Amino acid sequence: MTDVRSIDLFHVLVPLRKSIKHASFERASSDNLIVRVTLRDGTVGHGEGLPRPYVTGETIDSTFASLVKLDLPRTLEDVAGLESLVRRLVGFVLPEAQADPRGMAGNAARCALELALLDAFARREGRSVGEAIPWMGSFGEMLNARPGPVRYSGAITAESPGKEIRSALKMRIYGFAQVKVKVGVPGQDDPARLARLRRILGRGMDIRIDANEAWSAGEVVERVRPLLPSRPSVLEQPVPHEEAEALATLRPMLGVPVMLDESLCGYPDAERAVALGTADLLNVRLSKCGGIGPSLKIMDLARRSGLGVQLGCHPGETGLLSAAGRQVACRVRGIRFLEGSYDRHVLARNLIREDITFGYGGRARPLPGVGLGVNVDPDALAALTVAHREVRYD
């Protein structure tokens, strides 16, 4: 017997305020998976994942299929409360992930389910999901004794010069300390763009660049060299994942620290990056990495291996994943870069009632309240739902 009475799976189509463009993809809306867990006492929790075929190989259909066939009563047998749930989830992987050498198949589905379960069980006990983080592993020095304030980065996507200038001016006026700039989009003059943005953002701004697999291993050194005068702090995913092992040789030649993103989707990816020396930093995102527990495990490996960490986000995340990211960010020390909580700046409509968008300078505080700290707006969920499937465990 399990305390879970049912799960509901929702395919929601989230509209964006404007199209988001980078070297790998362009989107004006986001296909998101929402999982709703209902416990036998009526307590409800929600979670979110963003299946992306070009990231973890998942689609909405594959996540539905995975979660519908999951034997959740057996998985959660004898789980009675939040702490026992967390202990059980530590070793929980979907069958498709077990067969995947990169450990990423099913990660968006696992993330959505994990968050919904944590949200429901934490709400029932009047706790925050953040309180459960210390139970997810022996992370020691990585965790703060108490949740603290955080500061998010800004982001400038590849647009027309006029729009990029306006974005940069907004970033500077709004007091951001860090900004990410997308590079590698065909037809863009990246050296000129970056020099122009550096002039506007100022000498003190931390500017990192994200190529989204734009360049081949054979050309990356030449592509990066003219960008160095603008002093980027980090270069994210410069080559396709299939060529990422070449970074072990190329990384010392690039003149800028390298962060892995598309090549960092599961714990085996992180182990490989450490063993081969292909990265200086790892970009951990809850959805692509399988949820809070697996993400913390990767972050801990990075810390023990001397690598930096970015806690990132996927374009189109609603307030559910924003809240989950905040719960993690407020409790983990030493996060080099933090992305997320862009909600009202990116989404034309959100799924949650609260506005948890970061404030001036990207600053944000821990979320009060139980569960993830946010509440789903049922009208918004109904309006954005494209498909729905209920699984009952009577």
Segments predicted by a language model, with ranges:
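Metal- or metallocofactor-binding catalytic centers and their adjacent structured scaffolds
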Residues: 6, 38-40, 44-125
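Shared catalytic-loop signature of beta/alpha-barrel
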Residues: 242-257, 264-363
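C-terminal extensions of enzymes
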Residues: 7, 345-394
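Metal-dependent enolase-superfamily TIM-barrel catalytic cores that perform enediolate-based chemistry
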Residues: 131-254
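Structured beta-strand/loop patches that form or line metal/cofactor-binding pockets in enzymes
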Residues: 1-57, 344-349, 391
